[in-house]
Amino acid sequence: MTNTKGKRRGTRYMFSRPFRKHGVVPLATYMRIYKKGDIVDIKGMGTVQKGMPHKCYHGKTGRVYNVTQHAVGIIVNKQVKGKILAKRINVRIEHIKHSKSRDSFLKRVKENDQKKKEAKEKGTWVQLKRQPAPPREAHFVRTNGKEPELLEPIPYEFMA
């Protein structure tokens, strides 16, 4: 049997609602404010068929470039064969949510500003870049009176 060519082909689980989350969409979904430049995650909601994004955009993150009464315009990167295209799509607000991907960065910016301010008052230099985790400190291992056992690999024997 051949594959059908429908818009919602293969979305049985993708657009289904979670367990005990069927029915009316919570009002908090409509109360969220979206502005130009916001970073949003696209996640299709099966209860609302209007303004639903195509399945290829499900789970993607984009930037808002246009806001209307019920929907927003989003710029999303989409891979088409060998190239990545910046696609502009219009999606209703039920199918998007603010992305948390930028929160950690903004938090770090605030912390760095605070560190800079304190360092300027003290007249000292402060490290602002994130550093990789250093190697663990040296420590002694307790043997409780037992001798350490030396482990050696078994020598290879060719059997033919």
UniProtKB/Swiss-Prot annotation:
PROSITE patterns: RIBOSOMAL_L21E. GO terms for cellular component: cytoplasm; cytosol; cytosolic large ribosomal subunit; endoplasmic reticulum; postsynapse; ribosome; synapse. It comes from the Eukaryota. GO terms for biological process: cytoplasmic translation. Residues 112-145 are annotated as: Disordered. InterPro entries: Ribosomal_eL21, Ribosomal_eL21_CS, Ribosomal_eL21_sf, Translation_prot_SH3-like_sf. Its main location: cytoplasm. It is found in: Cytoplasm, Cytosol; Cytoplasm; Endoplasmic reticulum. It holds the Pfam family Ribosomal_L21e. SUPFAM superfamilies: Translation proteins SH3-like domain (SSF50104). Component of the large ribosomal subunit. The ribosome is a large ribonucleoprotein complex responsible for the synthesis of proteins in the cell. Component of the large ribosomal subunit. Belongs to the eukaryotic ribosomal protein eL21 family. This is Large ribosomal subunit protein eL21.
